[in-house]
Structures are given as C-alpha cells and as structure tokens.
C-alpha cells in the first residue's frame, strides 16, 4: 500500500506525461506535493521504486519509467484506456533507449569508431545532462580501446587546468566505479551531472574542480553515482 504522498507523486508524474509529454522537474514535483526540499522527492521516488511502481533508467538524468498504477486508480476505465508505461528522460517525453555501443567504421587507413554524442555536461556549476543521442562523431579507435563509450559536449570552465575547455567534446567510457584521481561524469541526486575529478574525503565523495575559482564539493556516497570515466578529448578550432 502506498502512502498518500507516494500516490500523489506517482499520479502527478503519470498525468503530466500523458497531458503534455514533458516531464516534471524535481522542483515541479516538490512544489506539486508542497514539500520543503527535493530530498523528500528523492525519498518518495526510492520508495516507489522499491514497491515496483517505477523504475529508474540508468545513465540518464531524471529518467524514470512508470511501470504500474495503484489498484484504485488503475481500475478507473478513463485512466486505463490511456495508460501505458511512461518515461521521464531529461527534457524529452519519449521512451528512453540504452545508449548504443560504438559502431565500427568501415576499414580505412586511419581506423575509427562512431560514438554517440549524448548531450552537454557542466564543467562548472552542475546542470541537468545526459539526454538523448544528439548526433554521432567519429573517434580514432586507439583513443578509446574496449568497452562502451559516449561523448559529451563541455559547458563551463571548471576543468581548464586539466586541459578541458568550454566547447570541447569529451569521450567517456561507461563505468559505475572510479579510482582516486579519475576525471568522471558524476550524477548528483539522480538529477544533475557534472565532470569533475574523483576524490575521497573520509566516507564522503569529493568532486574536485581543476580551476581555483571553484570549490571542491563534498557529498555523501548515496548522493553520487559514477556514470563514466574520461578517456579522450576532441577540440575543434574555428
């Protein structure tokens, strides 16, 4: 059985997706349920996931799939006629698909693979990131090695001392763990993504910038998910 707040959140997500196809943000969910902070939304989403009503989609910011509705609500014929699992994915109301693996390019003198560019990521103040496949780029095969990869466009200057500039394209190897000192894609509170150097501070995770103008940010380990590790960089000169 769901609590009143859990049911309110589930129905709000479902109805918003059915009405407009545009997912509610965490701020909108917080305001709709009249909660004081987004941490309450995170707890409700976790509870709904544990009870099998929603499923989080990996490697995507704010991505949820509505699997089922409460029995009383699902029994309403007007609702049931329009019900199908709904997906919240970034700013798009479309079903999410797993990021495709790199596709080998035709044999050539300089071998390359095609890697999907999945969106923009902040090298500065975290922003919502990792959305749909925007386009593909060809990457020298020696740059990436084995594993699944994707690319992100950099927005911000917090990693300039690591040689990563605003407008660069970074190549990321899909990974859920990191070693101290790795430059990683970190997803904070399942909502915001940023590119930072991975550190530990006691039991907490420290996301360290490579620019003295930005402070190192400290989070509990339950608030940060590693989405991948930096393996390469592409820069275009105009």
Curated annotation (Swiss-Prot):
Gene3D superfamilies: Umud Fragment, subunit A, Winged helix-like DNA-binding domain superfamily/Winged helix DNA-binding domain
The protein, known as: LexA repressor
Organism: Sinorhizobium medicae (strain WSM419) (Ensifer medicae)
Function of the molecule: Represses a number of genes involved in the response to DNA damage (SOS response), including recA and lexA. In the presence of single-stranded DNA, RecA interacts with LexA causing an autocatalytic cleavage which disrupts the DNA-binding part of LexA, leading to derepression of the SOS regulon and eventually DNA repair.
Superkingdom in the source lineage: Bacteria
Residues at the catalytic site: 158 (for autocatalytic cleavage activity), 196 (for autocatalytic cleavage activity)
DNA-binding region(s), chain positions: 26-46
EC number: 3.4.21.88
One term of GO molecular function: DNA binding
Assembly information from the UniProt record: Homodimer.
């Amino acid at each position: 059985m769901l609590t009143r707040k859990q049911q309110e959140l589930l129905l709000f997500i479902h109805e918003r997706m059915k009405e407009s196809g545009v997912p509610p943000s965490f701020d909108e969910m917080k305001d709709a349920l009249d909660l004081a902070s987004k941490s309450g939304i995170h707890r409700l989403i976790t509870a709904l996931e544990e009870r099998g009503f929603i499923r989080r989609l990996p490697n995507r910011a704010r991505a949820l799939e509505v699997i089922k509705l409460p029995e009383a609500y699902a029994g309403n014929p007007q609702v049931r006629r329009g019900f199908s699992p709904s997906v919240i994915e970034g700013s798009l109301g479309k079903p999410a698909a797993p990021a495709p693996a790199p596709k080998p390019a035709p044999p050539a003198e300089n071998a390359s693979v095609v890697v999907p560019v999945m969106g923009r990521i902040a090298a500065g103040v975290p922003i919502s990131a990792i959305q749909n496949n925007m386009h593909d780029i060809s990457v020298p095969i020696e740059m990436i090695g084995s594993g699944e990869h994707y690319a992100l466009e950099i927005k911000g200057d917090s990693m300039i001392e690591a040689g990563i500039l605003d407008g660069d394209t970074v190549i990321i190897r899909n990974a859920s763990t990191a070693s101290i000192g790795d430059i990683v894609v970190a997803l904070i509170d399942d909502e915001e993504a940023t590119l930072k150097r991975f550190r530990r501070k006691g039991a907490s995770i420290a996301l360290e910038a490579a620019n003295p103008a930005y402070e190192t940010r400290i989070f509990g380990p339950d608030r940060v998910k590693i989405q991948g590790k930096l393996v390469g960089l592409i820069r275009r000169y105009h």
